[in-house]
């Protein structure tokens, strides 16, 4: 489904606004910008506050791509004992862990097949309201 909304080509500065930028340059399709691999992409809503230190709030929408290979410190959706969670991936000494994204790394979940923990996708965008 194509959904276009007005897009201003002028960048939003942090200073004083220019009165010459009060017009729309073109329309933009958010799907084209947020979704790179349609068959492998899904959106999921966040429930909980464990990721607020990395800018992910309760109720946010996450755009997730299952085709991407996660990197160290990627934000991921993981399956932990048949429950989907959003966590930060940390790789150390040939081991991979999931953390809450806070500065406290003491609460780690080891990723391995015996524990029934695996990464389901990489978070590519976080959508949240600022109002």
Walk through the language-model features, giving the residues of each.
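Structural motif
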Residues: 59-60, 74
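PDZ-domain C-terminal substructure recognizer with occasional recognition of PDZ-binding tails
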Residues: 80, 85-105, 109
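Short, hydrophobic/aromatic-rich segments at coil-to-beta transitions
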Residues: 41, 71-76
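Short coil-to-beta-strand transition motifs
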Residues: 58, 79-85, 117-118
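Short, positionally conserved secondary-structure boundary motifs
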Residues: 1-52, 83-84, 91, 95-96, ...
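C-terminal structural segments of small proteins and small subunits
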Residues: 105-112, 118-126
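Hydrophobic beta-strand signal
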Residues: 63-64, 77
């Amino acid at each position: 489904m194509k959904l276009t909304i007005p897009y201003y080509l002028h960048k939003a500065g942090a200073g004083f606004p220019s009165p010459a930028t009060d017009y729309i340059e073109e329309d933009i399709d958010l799907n084209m910008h947020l979704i790179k691999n349609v068959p492998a992409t899904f959106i999921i809503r966040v429930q909980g506050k464990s990721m607020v230190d990395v800018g992910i709030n309760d109720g946010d929408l996450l755009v997730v791509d299952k085709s991407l290979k996660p990197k160290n410190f990627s934000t991921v959706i993981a399956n932990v004992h048949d429950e989907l969670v959003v966590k930060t991936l940390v790789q150390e000494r040939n081991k991979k862990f999931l953390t809450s994204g806070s500065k406290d790394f003491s609460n780690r979940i080891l990723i391995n097949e015996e524990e029934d923990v695996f990464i389901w996708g990489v978070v590519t965008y976080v959508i949240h309201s600022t109002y």
